[in-house]
UniProtKB/Swiss-Prot annotation:
It comes from Pseudomonas paraeruginosa (strain DSM 24068 / PA7). This is Cytochrome c-type biogenesis protein CcmE. The lineage of its organism: Bacteria, Pseudomonadati, Pseudomonadota, Gammaproteobacteria, Pseudomonadales. InterPro entries: CcmE, CcmE-like_sf, NA-bd_OB-fold. GO terms for biological process: cytochrome complex assembly. The gene is ccmE. HAMAP family: CcmE.
Length: 162
């Protein structure tokens, strides 16, 4: 092999190694930013990975909110109408967080089935429900009980007085 050809081969190989490393780093960064959504039913059935950051959503079960007296630790139960998952969170909950309302929690699922959340997102207003929560409720057949953000048996007064 002559010196010119050898030099070209080395340059081409160096470029290929550089491009391969860049693609590998980009894929690694993208994979770490992916937060897959799981319903309480999927989590209870063991479909959600442990020790991986996930999103879990549903409705906060009434009477399940437990606040620590001496810290910002909070525990509550989220349901999709079929199954439930307990969520532990350390921090200040959003102002719109209420029992019976839709939320999405981001965190890691522990081996005991409790989602340790580092972020809790509450729905925007009375009429909004996250698309993932709406789909989970529809799949479990519970959506009709929570139409327009109302739990079954609750009355809601909108601007028209209905």
């Amino acid at each position: 092999m002559n010196p010119v050809r050898k030099k070209r081969l080395i340059i081409v190989l160096a470029i290929l190694v550089g491009v391969g490393a860049a693609v590998g780093l980009a894929l690694s960064a993208l994979q770490q930013n992916i937060n897959l959504f799981y319903t309480p039913t999927q989590i209870a059935n063991g479909e959600a990975p442990t020790d991986t950051r996930i999103r879990a959503g549903g409705l906060v079960e009434k009477g399940s909110l437990q606040r620590s007296a001496d810290s910002l630790n909070v525990r509550f139960v989220v349901t999709d109408g079929a199954k439930e998952v307990t969520i532990a969170y350390h921090g200040i909950l959003p102002d719109l967080f209420r029992e019976g309302q839709g939320i999405v929690a981001l965190g890691k699922l522990g081996g005991d089935g409790v989602l340790v959340a580092d972020e809790v997102l509450a729905k925007h207003d009375e009429n909004y429900m996250p698309p993932e929560v709406t789909k989970a409720l529809k799949d479990s057949g519970q959506l009709k009980h929570y139409e327009n953000g109302k739990a079954a048996g609750e009355t809601s007064y909108n601007q028209e007085g209905k």
